[in-house]
A protein has these predicted regions:
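A post-motif C-terminal structural segment
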Residues: 1-212
């Protein structure tokens, strides 16, 4: 929940001053998301300084208490549902896919994509149980690394591949939509279309505030 920065500024200090409760393990996450008295929740590692989740493939027993993206996402959904029962908007990012692209690491790139896929499944399962008009949109703001796979590979064998850069590319990215008004997502062609898609189906914030 929330991101980090690497310029020496410790985000958790300002968040605590603003009334946020910082949860850094599974136990605190469960307790914090269930506590009705907590109105602002964050999950930052290393004080918000390069506080990324460990890559899935690099997790060791030392990191077994660190929640994964699926757990953080479901906790955030439950937290918001409890406090805003009439509706809310949330952005969930599988940022480690991007990081693996920058480092041209095929192993982490594939595994983090799988982890994000697992998160999308969990979010969809949660949404299906809610009696609400829910829209789930899955896309990316860009591709990273210029990854290209070459030919077929046997099951269990990493594919032959090349990278063209360590930065973002202009490669097209997919858009998937599920739920309420999902058919309107077919018109999305540019990044800015995502904004207009939600603007047209989500009530203004003033209306949501009044409902909640």
């Amino acid at each position: 929940l929330m991101g980090g920065r690497a310029d020496g500024y410790f985000i958790d200090e300002s968040l605590l001053e603003a009334g946020y409760k910082n949860v850094t393990n599974r136990e605190l996450l469960a307790a914090g998301s269930a506590d009705q008295k907590v109105m602002h929740l964050a999950s930052l590692y290393d004080g918000g300084k390069k506080g990324h989740l460990k890559y899935t493939l690099e997790r060791s027993p030392d990191h077994e208490d660190q929640a994964n993206l699926s757990e953080l996402s479901i906790a955030a959904l439950k937290f918001l549902k409890q406090r805003f029962p009439k509706g809310f908007f949330i952005v969930i990012e599988g940022a480690r896919i991007d990081h693996a692209g920058h480092s041209n690491n095929i192993y982490n790139n594939i595994r983090e994509t799988q982890s994000f896929h697992e998160t999308v499944k969990k979010v969809q399962e949660w949404a299906e149980k809610q009696n609400a008009k829910t829209t789930l949109l899955v896309t990316a703001d860009h591709e990273t690394g210029g990854l290209e796979l070459h030919g077929d590979s046997p099951k269990g064998v990493w594919p032959a591949h090349t990278w063209s850069t360590g930065w973002h590319t202009d490669q097209k990215v997919p858009v998937y939509a599920w739920g309420y008004a999902s058919e309107k997502a077919e018109k999305i062609r540019h990044n800015t279309d995502v904004y207009h898609f939600f603007k047209n189906i989500v009530p203004p914030s003033s209306e949501l505030a009044a409902k909640n």
